[in-house]
Amino acid sequence: MEVATLGGGCFWCTEAVFKRVKGVVSVKPGYSGGKVPNPTYEEVCTDETGHAEVVQITFDPSVITYRELLEIFFEIHDPTTPNRQGNDVGSQYRSIILYHSEEQKKIAEEMIKLYERKLGKKVVTELVPFEAFYEAEDYHHDFYDKHKNYPYCKLVIDPKVKKFMKNFPDKASIRI
């Protein structure tokens, strides 16, 4: 098994998508990329901890590669806008890849260049070494699956899950 740590806006969105990927064993929402140990959601939302909302993904590389995970990652969020995804604004929503090895770093650098060419814009995704992951509070876990009728889920998360299912049908482990 391998681990990937990615932030692409609200972790409810990224968790909902990556939970549906074949080869993904677990997805945990949390905080990473900052300097404050054991931050709370409220602290992260102040923009003072330096942390981003991220997901930590444990995956089977014989089923899904790190490169394929990054392809999904870049397709389900906007990697060209700093500190924002849609109406979610703040540094905690920034696009960030926290690499766990030099191989992951190399692949991420290649994917950033690929998406800059593909999108015709500068990709602002931060690429930094993984240091620590702080798991989010329980109420953030499986948020989408527990609250599908919540307006945010219908308006923001549903389109991302549907886009993943449409663009990566061979990578989907379950339907909506």
Curated annotation (Swiss-Prot):
Any Pfam family the entry gives: PMSR
EC id: 1.8.4.11
Reaction catalyzed: L-methionyl-[protein] + [thioredoxin]-disulfide + H2O = L-methionyl-(S)-S-oxide-[protein] + [thioredoxin]-dithiol; [thioredoxin]-disulfide + L-methionine + H2O = L-methionine (S)-S-oxide + [thioredoxin]-dithiol
Entries under Gene3D superfamilies matching the protein: Peptide methionine sulphoxide reductase MsrA
Residues annotated as catalytic: 10
Keywords associated with the record: Oxidoreductase
GO biological process terms on file: protein modification process
Domain of life: Archaea
InterPro entries, A to Z: Met_Sox_Rdtase_MsrA_dom (IPR002569), Met_Sox_Rdtase_MsrA_sf (IPR036509)
Enzyme class: oxidoreductase
A GO term, aspect molecular function: peptide-methionine (S)-S-oxide reductase activity
Protein family membership: Belongs to the MsrA Met sulfoxide reductase family.
UniProt cross-references to NCBIfam families, sorted A to Z: msrA
Function summary: Has an important function as a repair enzyme for proteins that have been inactivated by oxidation. Catalyzes the reversible oxidation-reduction of methionine sulfoxide in proteins to methionine.
PANTHER family (UniProt xref): PEPTIDE METHIONINE SULFOXIDE REDUCTASE, PEPTIDE METHIONINE SULFOXIDE REDUCTASE MSRA 2
The protein's name in its UniProt record: Peptide methionine sulfoxide reductase MsrA
Originating organism: Sulfolobus acidocaldarius (strain ATCC 33909 / DSM 639 / JCM 8929 / NBRC 15157 / NCIMB 11770)
